[in-house]
Amino acid sequence: MNTPTVENMKNMIHLLFMLFLFQSCTSQSNTDTNIDAIKKVENGLTTRVHIEGDSTWSIEKRMKHYGIPGVSIAVIHNGKIAWAKGYGIQDKESKAPVTKHTLFQAAATTMPVTAYGALRLVEKNKLNLDENINSYLKSWKVPENEFTKEKKVTIKNLLNHSAGIYPRGTGSYSIDDKIPTLVEILNGTYPAINEPITTNKEPDESVRFAYASYVPIQQMMLDVDGRTFSEIMNELVLEPLEMNNSTFNQSLTPELLKRRATGYLQDGSMVKGRGKVHPSMASDGLWTTAEDYAKFITNVQQTLNGKSTKGLSKDLTELMGKPYGVSNPSWSFTLGLGFQLINKNDDIYLRHHGWNTGFYAEIMAHRDKGYGVVVMTNSTFPEFNAEVIRAVAQSYHWDNYLPVHKKVEIERSIIDKITGRYKLNNTIIEVFEKGNQLFTKDILDVDGDELIKVSDSLFVRRNSSRFIQFKPDAQNGQINMFYINRNDRSITSTITKVDSDIKDPVEFLLEGDFEKALNAYKTLKEQSPDHPAITEDYINDVGYRFYHDHRMKLSLNTFKLNMMLYPNSFKVYDSYAEACKKAGETDLAILNYNKSLELNPENNRARQRLQELQKGE
C-alpha cells in the first residue's frame, strides 16, 4: 500500500475545497434564482389575456382589492416542489399569519385525491372499475330506474361524472347542526338537506359535474374496507405520499385547529364556526396545505414519467390524466378519472378547482412536463386564484398557457360596422364605443370589457382566452360575431346581429319595470311555450346571477316573477326565500320556505334554512 505524499495530500485538500466552493456557489445561485422567481410571481398577477404594455399587480394589492384574508401557494418546477409560501392571515381575530403549514379546506379539489384512493383499491384487486357499483355497495344501492335498465352505474362513471347522478350537490353543515350519516345523505332523509341521490340520465350518455357522484364512491369504500373514510384515505394516499399536514377528519385535533384557516364570506364576515362541516368527505372534505397538495400532484407527475413507484401504479395513474367517455361541448376541458384536463395546443394540464363556504382552491399542473401550482384561499374569489396561476405560468415560462398580444388600432369603418346588439341563445350581447374604445358586454352585466384588435381579423378581451371575429353573412351580408377556439381556430359559437329596437323581456327588469317584464314573459310563454328563455330553470339562473353579484333588488324581482309564472313549483319559492334571507327580509323568507315545504315536504334544504331562521328570531 502506497503512503500519500505531502504533495498529494495538498492536492486532495485543494480539490475538496474547490468542490465545496463550487457546491456553495451552485446552492447560492439556485437560491438567488428561486428568490427572483418568487418576486416575479408576487408582482406578476395579470388578466386571462395579457396585452403588451399592460401593468401587472402584486399579490398584496390583489388580496386587498378582493378582500382576501389569506392565501397559500405551492409552486412545482422540474417535477419537484420549488417553493411554498403563505401570505396574509389565517384568522382576523388572532392575526396569525398564513404559513406553508396552514390548513385550508380543499373543497372539490378533494375529488382527484379520492379518485386516487379508489384506484389504489382497484390495484389491490378489491374493486373493478367497470363493475356495477351496486355489486360493492351494502348499506345502500344506486336506485334502479328507467335510466339504469340497459346500462348500470360503474365506478368509472362516478369518478368522471358520467353516471347521470342527480342532484348536483349534497350541501354542508354548521358545527351546531345535526350532522347526517352518509346513508341519510344518500337517501335524502332528515337531517340531510339534499334530495335523494339517484340517476336521471343513462350512464355514459353525457357528463355532468356533480359533487354527489362521489358520495356513492365514499360509501362503497366504507362497505368494502370496513374502516372510516379518514382511516382508509390515510393508509391509501396521505401516509404513502407524506401528506403529513392533511386529514379527512371533520373534527380537527387541537394541534391542527391552531393551524387551520378560518373561512370568510365575500362580504368579509366569518363563516359560522370558522368553516362548514362536510360529511360527504369524498367530494369536498379534505383539509390540507398547498404544499401537501403539491406533494400529491408531483407524485402523479413523477409516476406518469416513470420516476416514482410510490403509491399508485403508472397504468392506473394514466387513467387520471386521459380523457374518458363523452365530453361536454360547453366545457373548456375534458374529464379523466378525478382530474379535469385542459388541452392548450397539445399541452395537457391537470386542473381542478373547488368552492366551499369561505374557502376556494385551484390547482393547475402540466401532466407531462413537471410544473404546476396550488393556490388556496380562505375566501371565495376565483379570479384571484387564476391571476396567481397566470403569474406562475409567466414567471416559469409554461408552454402555451398565457396568451400575450399586441394591441392593433381599429379603423373607424370597422367600428361603425360592428357596433350593435347580438344574440346568442338567451343572451343579448352589446358592442359599443366609449371614449374612443370598443367594449362588449352581456346586457345582464353592469360593466363592459374592452374589445381589443390583435390582428387583421381577430379581437380579444382581457378576461377570455377565446378569439372574437366579425364577418358578414354569406346570404344577407349582415355582420355576425363569432367565438373562435384559440387552439384549433374552429368556430365555437355564432352570435347573430339583431335589431336594436327589439327588447328582451329581462331588459324591463333591468329598467325597474316589473309589470312590463311580467307581461313580456307571459306573452312569450303563450306564444312560444318551449322558448328556452321562459323556462323555470333559466329564469332561476338569472335570479342567482343577480344574487351572486349582490344586485338584490333585481334578484328578488326575478325570483318573484318566476313564482308568478310557475306557482306550483317548490323550487321557485325556495329561491325567493333564499334571496329574502340575504336581503334581511326574514318574515318573507320564512313564509316562502314554508310554501316550498308545503309543495314538497321532502325539501330538506328548506326545512334546515327555516329552522335556522326561526332559531334567530
Where are the language model's segments positioned?
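Short active-site loop at a secondary-structure junction
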Residues: 62-72, 94-157, 198-212, 281-284, ...
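Short, charged, amphipathic alpha-helices and their helix-cap/turn boundaries
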Residues: 51-55, 135, 174-202, 227-246, ...
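Active-site helix/loop module of the DD-peptidase/beta-lactamase fold
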Residues: 56, 105-109, 121-170, 219, ...
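Catalytic loop of the DD-peptidase/beta-lactamase superfamily, centered on the K-T-G motif
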Residues: 25-85, 170, 222-227, 231-235, ...
